[in-house]
């Protein structure tokens, strides 16, 4: 005996909401699937990237002017000499976390002027 798709849809249309929820749970258990909507993938990531309001400033490498980069890190973060040196020596390292676009751009400019390679995330 074969049941058509229309027969199934008509049967579901006659069910109460509670019965439909129970049917969905039964499908999930029987077939090992989830009724959750599939993620939209890269399109969602692109929208999120456009809406980003907070940035992390990442020091990728100090370059040849390490002393100037340490001074720039101290200026931007308020860290002591030892702590700033540890950040620079530990590159790649996060210099600033969750700052505005303007602050991140200014920090990047200061660090690059000092000779560092910098990335905003």
Swiss-Prot record:
Any one GO molecular function term: structural constituent of ribosome
| Alphabetical UniProt keywords | Ribonucleoprotein, Ribosomal protein
In this entry, which stretches build a coiled coil? none
- Tell me the Gene3D superfamilies matching this sequence: 3.30.1390.10, Single helix bin
A single GO BP: translation
List the GO cellular component terms: cytosolic large ribosomal subunit
Q: Which family does it belong to?
A: Belongs to the bacterial ribosomal protein bL12 family.
Cited function: Forms part of the ribosomal stalk which helps the ribosome interact with GTP-bound translation factors. Is thus essential for accurate translation.
Q: How does it assemble?
A: Homodimer. Part of the ribosomal stalk of the 50S ribosomal subunit. Forms a multimeric L10(L12)X complex, where L10 forms an elongated spine to which 2 to 4 L12 dimers bind in a sequential fashion. Binds GTP-bound translation factors.
Q: What is this protein called?
A: Large ribosomal subunit protein bL12
Source organism of this protein record: Pseudomonas fluorescens (strain SBW25)
